[in-house]
């Protein structure tokens, strides 16, 4: 867990005095970098009693073909380009907006796989 509250340090280097304890709603989590590989998902309870599916790895994507108007489940070969980070393409990290190479062509990821537990994409070639 990561605490996302205000720092105790002032810009001058001094300390702010503590007015209260840390609160549970100020906590966050480490980000999950979804990789290509055997499917691994973890169910995590979030605020309001809801759940998020953290996707650690997956080798299939639901790709929408706009010409045919159909969605096909295809195997992900690699990450071609990722605008989120320079080195994500090299490490095969899948995020929203990443361009992935699939068995039917290149596709752009349209969802947030690390928070939704599935990879959805739209065919671009």
Curated annotation (Swiss-Prot):
InterPro entries with a match to the protein in the record: Ribosomal_eS8, Ribosomal_eS8_CS, Ribosomal_protein_eS8_arc, Ribosomal_Se8/biogenesis_NSA2
Gene Ontology biological-process entries: translation
UniProt-annotated stretches for the region Disordered: 1-20
Pfam families in alphabetical order: Ribosomal_S8e
Keyword Ribosomal protein: yes
PROSITE patterns documented for this protein: RIBOSOMAL_S8E
Keyword Ribonucleoprotein: yes
One of the record's GO molecular function terms: structural constituent of ribosome
Keywords carried by this UniProt record: Ribonucleoprotein, Ribosomal protein
GO cellular component: ribonucleoprotein complex; ribosome
Family, per entry: Belongs to the eukaryotic ribosomal protein eS8 family.
Subunit structure and binding partners: Part of the 30S ribosomal subunit.
PANTHER family to which the protein is assigned, alphabetical: 40S RIBOSOMAL PROTEIN S8 (PTHR10394)
Protein name stated in the entry: Small ribosomal subunit protein eS8
């Amino acid at each position: 867990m990561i605490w996302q509250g205000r720092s105790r340090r002032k810009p001058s280097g001094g300390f702010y005095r503590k007015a209260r304890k840390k609160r549970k709603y100020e906590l966050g989590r480490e980000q999950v970098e979804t990789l290509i590989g055997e499917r691994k998902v973890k169910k995590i309870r979030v605020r309001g009693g809801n759940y998020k599916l953290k996707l650690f790895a997956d080798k299939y994507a639901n790709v929408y073909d706009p010409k045919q108007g159909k969605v096909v489940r295809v195997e992900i070969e690699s990450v071609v380009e990722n605008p989120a980070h320079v080195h994500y393409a090299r490490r095969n990290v899948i995020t929203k907006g990443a361009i992935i190479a699939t068995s039917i062509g290149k596709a752009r990821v349209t969802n947030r796989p690390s928070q939704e537990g599935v990879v959805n994409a739209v065919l671009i070639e």
